[in-house]
From Swiss-Prot:
Record's protein name: Large ribosomal subunit protein bL19
Gene: rplS
Matching InterPro entries: Ribosomal_bL19, Ribosomal_bL19_sf, Translation_prot_SH3-like_sf
PANTHER family with a match to the protein in the record: LARGE RIBOSOMAL SUBUNIT PROTEIN BL19M, RIBOSOMAL PROTEIN L19
UniProt cross-references to Gene3D superfamilies, sorted A to Z: 2.30.30.790
One record GO biological process: translation
Organism the protein comes from: Baumannia cicadellinicola subsp. Homalodisca coagulata
GO cellular component: cytosolic large ribosomal subunit
Upper lineage: Bacteria, Pseudomonadati, Pseudomonadota, Gammaproteobacteria, Candidatus Palibaumannia
Length: 115
């Protein structure tokens, strides 16, 4: 029984790019407004990742008009069209909730040099 559930969940999973907390990403999401369907872009920094197989999620934070906006996305959701990694950040923590209290230059993160 458990193998059957695992097999079905594995079929539902998407191939996603590798990203970590501190990375700046652009997430394109399908939005339905009335009878129309369009793509909406949400660009920000990943502050948390929750790894739970098919139920995995990640939190993206951006500053919009001086206000912090956070959005939680389910990784394998059908409404996600694409995830693009714009910049790789170098952090030593898995959850970057401390960035909520910081503004401006204090909220910057060093760039990870990949070799």
């Amino acid at each position: 029984m458990f193998n059957l559930i695992q097999h079905i969940e594995h079929e539902q999973m998407k191939n996603l790019p590798a990203f970590r907390p501190g990375d700046s990403v652009e997430v394109k999401v399908w939005v339905v407004e009335g009878s129309k369907k369009r793509l909406q872009s949400f660009e920000g920094m990943i502050i948390a990742i929750r790894n739970r197989g098919l139920h995995s999620a990640f939190t993206v934070r951006k500053i919009s008009n001086g206000e912090g906006v956070e959005r939680v996305f389910q990784m394998h959701s059908p409404i996600i069209e694409s995830i693009t990694v714009k910049r790789c950040g170098f952090v030593r923590k898995a959850k970057l909730y401390y960035l909520r209290k910081r503004t401006g230059k204090a909220a910057r993160i060093k760039e990870r040099i990949s070799s």
